Amino acid sequence: MLASIFSLNVLQTALELGCIYALVALALFLSYSILNIADLSTDGCFTLGCAVACQVALTGRPILALVAAMAAGVCSGFVTAFLQTRLGVESIMAGIIVNTGLYTINLAVMGFSSTMSLVKTDTVFSLAKGSLSFLGGWYKLAIALAMILLAGAAMLGFLGTRLGLSIRATGDNAAMVRASSINPAFTITVGLCISGALCALSGGLLAQYQKSCDINVGTGMVTIALASLIIGETLLGKRTMLRRIIGVVFGSCLYRFIVAVALRFNVPAAAMKLVSAIIVAIAISMPAIKEKVAFEQRKHGACRRRVTTGKEGK
């Protein structure tokens, strides 16, 4: 029973999807953890990348499809940032507005059809299959892993640059950044554009991975990415930027593995949203639970020391 549940196939699928969805978690890491902005346009931006990638891939250019998806994500991030920085809209409302508008835009990109298929179309995975034939069935994981490694390395390098440090400072204290003659509106715009590009890239990669696109493919993506982010930070900590980025990828893969195991237990598809909600709730409450357990341990330790001291005094 356990062998069938924790099989190599389950692990492989979880790692493949984990690396693909880790790009969304990395996008949320930049907007939520670094910039301290709750960007709720993630769901629509993910679907936008998926739809744009499908349309471009149908022309026979799967690599260009990923670039086009990223460009579309940049546009989405720019609009979100423009609403916040220029029109004074709150970050949550700006995300909701963009996400609502993207639903119609995504439908238009998909030709006002709710689904698209790439079954008879070349993808980055099918193109690389011949070159990576020595990996056997693991070639998809190699591509997804290469993408997240490149994105993670680029993110780590960028956040160490002057502009990257300015973005990090904006999330910590925008007033201090403004006093340093740095325009926080510019840093927020750059950060959200990069976040949108990563989110749309994830959608484009998923479209080519599963050879299809659905108008509802991005539903709940922000909660899934947030769960991955918190799982990684809880288990690996956030002492250094490198550890935090690795934690994002690890959390995403672990989340997909939990979902894959749930499916192996024959959990109905209709109940998967409930499973996802439970995982998210546990992930979000983990820091508070750890803090409470640590407090109880310290309290019991102090009680034992007082008892020991009292006995020695007698």
Question: Across the structure, where does each feature detected by a protein language model lie?
Answer:
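Membrane-interfacial amphipathic/re-entrant helices at transmembrane-helix boundaries
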Residues: 1-24, 52, 58-64, 129-141
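Cytosolic-side transmembrane-helix boundaries in multi-pass membrane proteins
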Residues: 6, 154, 172-179, 183-186, ...
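Loop-to-transmembrane alpha-helix initiation sites
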Residues: 17, 91-93, 114, 119, ...
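Membrane-embedded helix boundary and interhelical linker motif in transport proteins
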Residues: 32-87, 128-134, 239-240, 264
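Alpha-helical transmembrane segments within multi-pass membrane transporters and channels
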Residues: 61-100, 105, 148-150, 250-251, ...
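Helix-loop-helix "hairpin" substructures at the membrane interface of multi-pass membrane proteins
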Residues: 76, 136-217, 222
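Transmembrane helix-bundle core of multi-pass membrane transporters
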Residues: 91, 102-160, 190, 271, ...
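Transmembrane alpha-helical segments in multi-pass inner-membrane proteins
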Residues: 199, 203-274
